[in-house]
Amino acid sequence: MAGSVLMGVGDKTADAWREHVGGALAKMKIDDTSANDGAEMGPVIDGAAQSRITQTIASATATGAEVAYNGAGRVPSRGFFVGPTLLDRVAPTMSLFQDEIFGPVLSMVRPKTLDEAIATMNTLGYGNGATLFSASGAAARQFTREIQCGMLGINIGVPAPMALFSFSGWNQSFFGDLHVQGIEGVMFYTRQRVVLSRWDKSYVRAQGW
């Protein structure tokens, strides 16, 4: 998603995720995706976006975030590239956590409990999609009931539904009166009409109609 946050509940879980994700980023192929079919990640949209993203990373590290993986040295020299970056121990007060970055940056926050994780996520002004990876049905039920978000996944990487269901962001991730896709998407193009009728023999004309 545009603002990507990874929460490992408990240090043991967070450490495992840090190692796994950092290893995956180190293998990622970065290049011009229009010229190289093997490239997995291309540049950002323009120089302004490149500058904004790198400044956000610098601000977070200057205020306490740890660089778990820095891919800046692996990007092509030409183009508006930003290397894939994993930042650990990000504080919920940082702009990296609060704002949508729209760049290849993953933030890690380390809540001690699921309750703390949900409470922290619910401080965000956005509410597009969130996923819980867990073997616990109780944790999944709590997550789906308490998280303030429109699209939820349980053990699913990206909780974006098919067109049969609404793309249902909440809070600042929702603009307008109706969501796109699903029945709400159909209703956007629908003009409703209500007809009230009553029939009995007193309305029958002599001609029979």
Model-inferred region functions:
Residues I30, A62-G73:
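Short secondary-structure junctions
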Residues T56-T61:
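Helical element adjacent to the flavin cofactor pocket in flavoenzyme catalytic cores
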Residues P43-T54:
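Short beta-strand to alpha-helix junction loop
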Residues V9-K12, K29, T33, G73-R74, ...:
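Conserved C-terminal structural/oligomerization subdomain of aldehyde/semialdehyde dehydrogenase
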Residues A35-M41:
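Short linear capping/connector segments at secondary-structure termini
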